[in-house]
Amino acid sequence: MHDANIRVAIAGAGGRMGRQLIQAALALEGVQLGAALEREGSSLLGSDAGELAGAGKTGVTVQSSLDAVKDDFDVFIDFTRPEGTLNHLAFCRQHGKGMVIGTTGFDEAGKQAIRDAAADIAIVFAANFSVGVNVMLKLLEKAAKVMGDYTDIEIIEAHHRHKVDAPSGTALAMGEAIAHALDKDLKDCAVYSRESHTGERVPGTIGFATVRAGDIVGEHTAMFADIGERLEITHKASSRMTFANGAVRSALWLSGKESGLFDMRDVLDLNSL
């Protein structure tokens, strides 16, 4: 990677998240917008990426071919869909490009492909790039170690009507943080749905509830409930810019790293706390 400005490429440049990633890349010192990508056949191809994002002319035009811009970026930022991200991952691995992956909804094979690629390239892969969410994950680990053995743990998340996966990647990351703190595997203790006659709550499980409505950017709550008291730890996002800023900050953090799989807690040095 270059020692000067880190040049980033943005996938899905015409989407809501893509436009905010462009804004964030143009705003952060030490980062340069090198390329912007959209799918083949998009009406946005050839548009100026900065103008598309409402940030003024940049001279970077929206392209559909990664091969055409492979010399224009060092780190690829991807918040698209799993199938597209895995195609981009293969390209970046072949060409030695770092990646910041905010795509959610991967199956186990997809996650393994990311782990495998990290042997050759540096990747930041996180369910949520918000600073606040990642601080929350650390707090959940602490709370689980103190209260997790005797409380009922529930995770409630809410997002906009257009979100296609559930539970959210962030909700799953919350569950994994709690389960790990309790020396459990989330797949063995998660309860993702309840309906009809469920019987009493099974001790030691982690419940999930999902809301999809309106334009909710993202709300997540973890509840540790006992008889007589409960602790709730909540994060509410009011703008996608918090995710975009964190992702671009992660791209800058990758400077000088040749390989390895990292998450936002590494970027923020939360693992040392």
Curated annotation (Swiss-Prot):
TM regions (residue ranges): none
Catalytic activity as recorded in UniProt: (S)-2,3,4,5-tetrahydrodipicolinate + NAD(+) + H2O = (2S,4S)-4-hydroxy-2,3,4,5-tetrahydrodipicolinate + NADH + H(+); (S)-2,3,4,5-tetrahydrodipicolinate + NADP(+) + H2O = (2S,4S)-4-hydroxy-2,3,4,5-tetrahydrodipicolinate + NADPH + H(+)
Domain of life: Bacteria
Residues that bind NADP(+): 39
Keyword hit for Amino-acid biosynthesis: yes
Residues the entry annotates as binding NAD(+): 12-17, 38, 102-104, 126-129
UniProt cross-references to Pfam families, sorted A to Z: DapB_C, DapB_N
GO cellular component terms, semicolon-separated: cytosol
GO terms, molecular function: 4-hydroxy-tetrahydrodipicolinate reductase; NAD binding; NADP binding; oxidoreductase activity, acting on CH or CH2 groups, NAD or NADP as acceptor
Entry keyword set: Amino-acid biosynthesis, Cytoplasm, Diaminopimelate biosynthesis, Lysine biosynthesis, NAD, NADP, Oxidoreductase
EC identifiers of the protein: 1.17.1.8
Pathway(s) it belongs to: Amino-acid biosynthesis; L-lysine biosynthesis via DAP pathway; (S)-tetrahydrodipicolinate from L-aspartate: step 4/4
UniProt subcellular location: Cytoplasm
Chief location: cytoplasm
InterPro entries: DapB_C, DapB_N, DapB_N_CS, DHDPR_bac, NAD(P)-bd_dom_sf
GO biological process terms held by the UniProt record: diaminopimelate biosynthetic process; lysine biosynthetic process via diaminopimelate
Record: active site: 159, 163
Similarity comment: family membership: Belongs to the DapB family.
Subunit-level organization: Homotetramer.
Task of the protein: Catalyzes the conversion of 4-hydroxy-tetrahydrodipicolinate (HTPA) to tetrahydrodipicolinate.
Stated name of the protein: 4-hydroxy-tetrahydrodipicolinate reductase
Organism: Shigella boydii serotype 4 (strain Sb227)
